[in-house]
Amino acid sequence: MKDDHGLEPHSVNFAPRLNWLRAGILGANDGIVSIAALVVGVAAATSDSGPIVVAGIAGIIAGSLSMALGEYVSVSSQRDSETSLIKRERQELQDFPAEELAELAEIYEHKGLSPSTAALVAKELTAHDVVAAHLDAELGINERQLTNPWHAAVSSAVSFLAGAALPMLAITLTPDNWRILFTFVASLVALALTGGIGAYLGQSPILRPVLRVTAGGALALALTWGIGALLGSNTSL
């Protein structure tokens, strides 16, 4: 019988990849849904292109800044917390080396290793890189892979702008009679693509994320279109 396990891809650094993927997909989806819903709602309230363009541009600027700021604050808080934990772990290793070695051995013993094997693993890992060994086993932290908050902020802003560009172009370049429908369809197709790409890169089933994100986007667009149409009709009375 052929063993195909050797063909299965494995990645040691998969967690950072998922973090960047999450931020990128979230930013793009937020840009698509936010700006599409905004311009569709305004277009439902008025046929004048001026307010639609102004609202779209304002939404893009506000949304990209909000995404960047939110990601910067979130990642900075996480990094500060991880840095504090790393500092404390270094101090404990300096003050209580024997106790920390016993703790590391106990961790691997709880994972199923025999006491003698766990002690040997702990000693070898400690000899290789004592700080990295304890950070990984006790806290799940890799000191070399702490996320840069500035990188995260720029990534979120750029991904939001990339997602927001599609509905903005769709609503401004399409004839008046078709712009709402075309923006609606183009946005849902874009959401399906981002959902599918995210699932593929994350090595998860594709159908469920695609259905989930397109259903949510359709609901958001339908609600804002309805509210815009209602407000537009009331204003014209």
Task: Locate the predicted segments by residue.
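C-terminal ends of transmembrane helices
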Residues: 72-76, 142, 195-205
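Cytosol/matrix-facing amphipathic helices and coiled-coil assembly/linker segments
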Residues: 1-23, 75-157
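Residue-level signature of catalytic and energy-coupling elements of molecular machines
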Residues: 30, 69, 118-122, 160, ...
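Juxtamembrane boundary at the C-terminal end of a transmembrane helix
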Residues: 225-237
